[in-house]
Curated annotation (Swiss-Prot):
Keywords: Amino-acid biosynthesis, Cytoplasm, Histidine biosynthesis, Isomerase. Pfam families: His_biosynth. GO terms for molecular function: 1-(5-phosphoribosyl)-5-[(5-phosphoribosylamino)methylideneamino]imidazole-4-carboxamide isomerase activity. Its EC number is 5.3.1.16. HAMAP family: HisA (MF_01014). CDD domains: HisA. It comes from Methanospirillum hungatei JF-1 (strain ATCC 27890 / DSM 864 / NBRC 100397 / JF-1). It is found in: Cytoplasm. The gene is hisA. Disulfide bonds: none annotated. One of its GO terms (cellular component) is cytoplasm. This is 1-(5-phosphoribosyl)-5-[(5-phosphoribosylamino)methylideneamino] imidazole-4-carboxamide isomerase. NCBIfam families: PRK13585.1 (NF010112). The lineage of its organism: Archaea, Methanobacteriati, Methanobacteriota, Stenosarchaea group, Methanomicrobia.
Amino acid sequence: MIVFPAVDILGGRCVQLVQGKRETATSYGDPLLCAESWINQGAEALHIVNLDGAFGSSKLNAEKITDVIIRTGVKTQLGGGIRSLDDARSWLDCGVDRIIISTFAADDPECLTILSEEYGSDRIMAGVDARAGEMVTHGWERPAGDFLEWADLFIRKGAGSLLYTNVSVEGLCNGIDPKPIRDLLSTVSVPVVVAGGITSPSDIKILKEADAAGVVLGSALYSGKITLQEALEAAG
């Protein structure tokens, strides 16, 4: 299982949000320094989110993100504001190993087919953001139906992996809700990385036993509720 420390970037700074709300941002400084710190502690991959992109400014932070990709040299997956084929291609061409497409994939699932044919399905990850079993899109504001049906559609259209985020617990550091994760993992055949609420080594062990391919650690890691070493040991 891969542990992905999150490097969420807003206004050129590394931040963490609560429940995805911009006004809750806590700044942790320069994104590259944060990324290098996690790598020095043993991280072999990073989960980068362009929050300005998610909030509507897809080109902001491009220089910062490219700098992290080039100077760290580790595996990266990137999401946030990828809402066109041009957006997707530009990130893939700049060296991101895997892009995460959520709202764009829900609005136009054929984008997954096009991109997987051009770049390979292993570089295309679909984001499944869910609340109470229902997919939510457009900044987690619009309910869109059963999340398992969306996961199946995304895979059929070409996604080589999924990022599952339980938005009900994201950023709260209160632990995971294992049931929907197990439901998803038992029905799909592609790797699934899990985000949202992961706070303790026991959370990670539960996900490992359920056969999750990876976990994203954000608020719990930055607040010190779990150390990267503890996470890596639980995942190992």
